[in-house]
Amino acid sequence: PLCLETIALYSAVDREGKRVVDLGCGEGRDVIQFAREGYEAVGIDISARGLKKAEAWAKKENIVISTIQSDLVSFRLGEEFDVVYSSGTLTYLPQDVRRAVFSNYKRFTRQGGLNAFNVFVEKPFLETPPDWGIDEHFYISGELLTYYWDWEIVRFEERILDCNSGGVPHKHAMDVMIARRV
């Protein structure tokens, strides 16, 4: 998974004191994993219920995380992080706000820090997933790279994944990118 791959880019010693923000953390799977690995971890999500579950899970494991309830469209970073991370939730950003949002993420990433994202990509040969919401927006292939042309691209891949969300078998196309501020 992208979370573990991102964690592996810093040695255990280098992780101490590093800050990560998980944009769209849901019920906390990845933000808790980052905290387990020594990061100061902050989770952002629109769902109060999801954040409460993340906080309860962290407490049960004796792990400290911070949470902020916000939608991703209006949320902007206001402090620096070593890792800005999101898995599958940047699809809620409409195309017209993306440039400004990614500029904000870049501005508040520390020198040498990482932005690690995966986003759903529209492909004409794949049907729209059955559980795709009206507030979800596809990216085009390689779009993430256009926002990070001035950073080191550590990894970029496009893949097609089998999925069974909503109980209906289907496929997703996804771009995965890890970029480093140099």
Which stretches of residues belong to each language-model region?
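Short catalytic micro-motifs in class I SAM-dependent methyltransferases
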Residues: 88-89
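Helix-to-beta-strand junctions that scaffold the AdoMet/dcAdoMet cofactor pocket
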Residues: 94, 109-110
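Class I (Rossmann-like) S-adenosyl-L-methionine-dependent methyltransferase catalytic domain
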Residues: 1-17, 21, 26-76, 95-100, ...
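A conserved beta-strand element that flanks and buttresses the S-adenosyl-L-methionine
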Residues: 85
